[in-house]
From Swiss-Prot:
HAMAP family the UniProt entry points to: PEPCK_ATP (MF_00453)
Record: residues binding ATP: 198, 217, 233-241, 282, 319, 444
Keywords: ATP-binding, Cytoplasm, Decarboxylase, Gluconeogenesis, Lyase, Manganese, Metal-binding, Nucleotide-binding
Keyword Cytoplasm in annotation: yes
Pathway(s) this gene product operates in, as recorded in its UniProt entry: Carbohydrate biosynthesis; gluconeogenesis
Function: Involved in the gluconeogenesis. Catalyzes the conversion of oxaloacetate (OAA) to phosphoenolpyruvate (PEP) through direct phosphoryl transfer between the nucleoside triphosphate and OAA.
Stored SUPFAM superfamilies: PEP carboxykinase N-terminal domain (SSF68923), PEP carboxykinase-like (SSF53795)
Free-text remark on how the cofactor is bound: Binds 1 Mn(2+) ion per subunit.
Entry's family note: Belongs to the phosphoenolpyruvate carboxykinase (ATP) family.
Gene this chain is encoded by: pckA
One of the GO BP terms on file: gluconeogenesis
Origin superkingdom: Bacteria
Subcellular location(s) of the protein: Cytoplasm
Identification of the protein by name: Phosphoenolpyruvate carboxykinase (ATP)
Length: 528
């Protein structure tokens, strides 16, 4: 099928009698509950279960191999190729399936708060609660914007349509297929709403760098003086917690672009973890759970409708989606200037990385490409003990282009705007996981605040003998023995052995970046 035929099929679907376009939040909440998709909690949130899939399905995600784009994509485990024929056949089947539904729901909106690079999107849903999720997560249009809205990309989500692998050419009944040429994202066989969010992020990670804009998997906030800070880190490293600061305004919690204008949020909402959530620990998220919010897989009493955020019986990956306006202390619209401080967060279960260290540009690019952390229980199915993981650019599942494209852009931006990068270990200290202890959040907050306030810009440092990292000798409010990881271990020989082991893992992982400059490898990585 060519793009015209694809568009005609889509037009026919959207002109059907079963279409609900741009319903309001109360209308979607009503639909979700009356159709038996979800229930209302005592706080007024819409709560749904996602069945078998309570997280992303990376093995079922494909990109169509197309002449116009195939030479740009970094093909492999993340970007799995699939043929146009497979896409076309599934597209026809999904459209036919959706035409036969009693009701469909359409959201029209945007990705990217910077008007210069904004992407117009539409999301077509089988479920009303999925459409409410899209309404709250993406950027909502004004009446004027809606009147002239023409979608650049369309997400089509049909969770109850299941592929037949033997016939349809997929690996399982589930599929997330992106056609960059036809500007369609086709999702079937999974009810996990996060697939919609991350598929649009993937599109932005493809489009923005081609406009000279660095797309980033990070949270961002800004101080009263306009000083912007970015927080990179994988699940469980403290990105959301550390960027929620009462003295700084939130730009966004997960996806951003960095253009010549500054930093902007790609989304219009937040998608936060709720496992073990409490009003004391994370008041901003807790207070955002109200009418209009969408809860995923959170345990709830069927009679009182009171949520139990400590109950991970359905999954540890319980979530809430809400518009960013549900957070009090935000920048609206979600745009700000150029970052002064960049924080790379890692949860090191080896317990050997410093709690904070200053990075040179080469080290920043090296650690950005490495994207090291320890995978913690609950972020993916089957993970019960922390295990080391390297996720390129702190977001490899969402990067269609070669990693070096993003790393080189980061290096250029650091040079252009004089940003200082810090590596912050929120993981273990005084020993590895099981013998050491988790870094105190109060210490991490103090160190991050000192970095953002510029107190570490000219501080005296010592160089770590294994990783070459520059460790501040003093940070007010943090014991000096905590700052140097080797000093925090009682058994120095055990520390040396663990540090050497992790350095070896870094070196082994970095072999896949054969085409990066020698300066990044030699000046950025471990000394041993």
């Amino acid at each position: 099928m060519n793009s015209v035929e694809i568009a005609n099929e889509l037009k026919e679907l959207l002109n059907g009698g079963n279409i609900n376009v741009q319903l309001s939040v109360p209308q979607l909440a009503e639909k979700a509950t009356s159709r038996g998709e979800a229930m209302l909690t005592v706080d007024g949130a819409v709560r749904a279960e996602t069945g078998k899939y309570t997280g992303r399905s990376p093995k079922d995600k494909y990109t169509v191999e197309e002449e116009s784009t195939k030479d740009q994509i970094d093909w492999g485990k993340v970007n799995q190729p699939i043929s146009s024929e497979v896409f076309d056949n599934l597209y026809v089947k999904v459209i036919k399936y959706l035409k036969e539904r009693d009701e469909l729901f359409v959201f029209k909106g945007f990705a990217g708060a910077d008007k210069d690079s904004q992407l117009s999107i539409q999301v077509i849903n089988e479920y009303a609660w999925h459409n409410l999720f899209a309404h709250q997560l993406f950027i909502r249009p004004t009446k004027e914007e809606l009147a002239s809205h023409v979608a650049d990309f369309t997400v089509i989500s049909a969770p109850n349509f299941k592929a037949d692998p033997a016939v349809d050419g997929t690996a399982s009944e589930t599929f997330i297929i992106v056609s960059l040429e036809k500007k369609i994202i086709l999702i079937g066989g999974t009810e996990y709403a996060g697939e919609m969010k991350k598929s649009i992020f993937g599109i932005m990670n493809y489009l923005l760098p081609q406009q000279g804009i660095l797309s980033m998997h990070c949270s961002a906030n800004v101080g009263e003086a306009g000083d912007v800070a970015l927080f990179f880190g994988l699940s469980g490293t403290g990105k959301t917690t550390l960027s929620a600061d009462p003295d700084r305004k939130l730009i966004g919690d997960d996806e951003h672009g960095w253009s010549d204008n500054g930093v902007f949020n790609i989304e219009g909402g937040c998608y936060a973890k709720t496992i073990n959530l409490s009003a004391e620990k994370e008041p901003e998220i807790y207070n955002a759970i109200r009418f209009g919010s969408v809860l995923e897989n959170v345990a709830v009493d069927p009679e009182t409708r009171i949520c139990d955020y400590d109950d991970g019986s359905l999954t540890e990956n319980t979530r809430v989606a809400y518009p960013i306006q549900y957070i009090e202390n935000i920048v609206d619209p979600s745009v700000a200037g150029h970052p002064k401080t960049i924080i790379f967060l890692t949860a090191d279960a080896f317990g050997v990385l410093p709690p904070i260290s200053k990075l040179t540009k080469e080290q920043a690019m090296y650690h950005f490409l490495s994207g090291f952390t320890s995978k913690l229980a609950g972020t993916e199915r089957g993970v019960t003990e922390p295990e080391p993981v390297f996720s390129t650019c702190f977001g490899s599942p969402f990067l269609p282009l070669p990693a070096t494209v993003y790393a080189e852009m980061l290096g250029q931006k650091i040079d252009e705007h004089g940003a200082q990068v810090y590596l912050v270990n929120t993981g273990w200290t005084g020993g590895e996981y099981g013998t050491g202890s988790r870094m105190k959040l109060s210490y991490t907050r103090t160190m991050v605040r000192a970095a953002i306030d510029g107190k570490l810009t000219n501080v005296e440092t010592t160089q770590d003998a294994v990783f070459g990292l520059h460790i501040p000798t003093a940070v007010e409010g943090v014991p000096s023995q905590v700052l140097n990881p080797r000093e925090a271990w009682a058994d120095k020989a055990a520390y040396d052995a663990k540090a050497a082991e992790l350095a070896g893992l870094f070196n082994e992982n970095f072999k896949k970046f054969a085409n990066v400059s020698e300066a990044i490898t030699t000046l950025g990585g471990p000394l041993k």
